[in-house]
Amino acid sequence: MTRDEIVAIFQKTGAMLSGHFRLTSGRHSNRYFQCALVLQHPDYSELLCRELAARFAGDGISVVIGPAMGGIIVSYEVARALGVRGLFAERENGVMTLRRGFSIEPGERVLVVEDVITTGGSVREVMEAVRKSGGTVAGAGVLVDRSNGAVDLGVRTEALLTAEVVSYAPEDCPFCKQGIPAVKPGSRKI
């Protein structure tokens, strides 16, 4: 898929939002990628995640995992495309962990996926959970990298769409200074 084709899907589904947003990282931005609006469409989910999976097809991946919430559908669809298990990690007492009977065997090659990254914090937390389980993090895949490739996760990282989106510390946010309230559209409470 070309970048233009991917952008067209995000635009068609209304997933590229403008306004004043408080991101999961705690930073503020005037743009937000609401991947749930794309992922609600099974055909688009399959198409995008198949493209992401293809980038790791020869890497011997045996498990795909993503953080709840944003990574659940991505994990499932990428795993399906690769023909492997798809898991998700979730927070328990504030720590990303494997629950619900999910496990990773020592030495399994694991691909960590997410819908959007800004700082990579959630992906790093899942990577730590994988390592604690004895798995080997073989790579990371995301639908959207808001950092335009600036985030270094320490493993090969593939993004379907990279975008340089300005974000601000809350104390430096021009929208806050104008009194414009921030919206928190994501799933994680901060």
Curated annotation (Swiss-Prot):
What would you give as a GO molecular function for this chain, any one? magnesium ion binding
UniProt pathway: Pyrimidine metabolism; UMP biosynthesis via de novo pathway; UMP from orotate: step 1/2
Annotated 5-phospho-alpha-D-ribose 1-diphosphate binding lies at 114-122
> Could you tell me which CDD domains the record lists for this protein?
PRTases_typeI
Supply the alphabetized keyword list.
Answer: Glycosyltransferase, Magnesium, Pyrimidine biosynthesis, Transferase
Read off the Pfam families from this record.
Answer: Pribosyltran
**Could you say which residues bind orotate here?**
118, 146
Q: What is this protein identified as? A: Orotate phosphoribosyltransferase
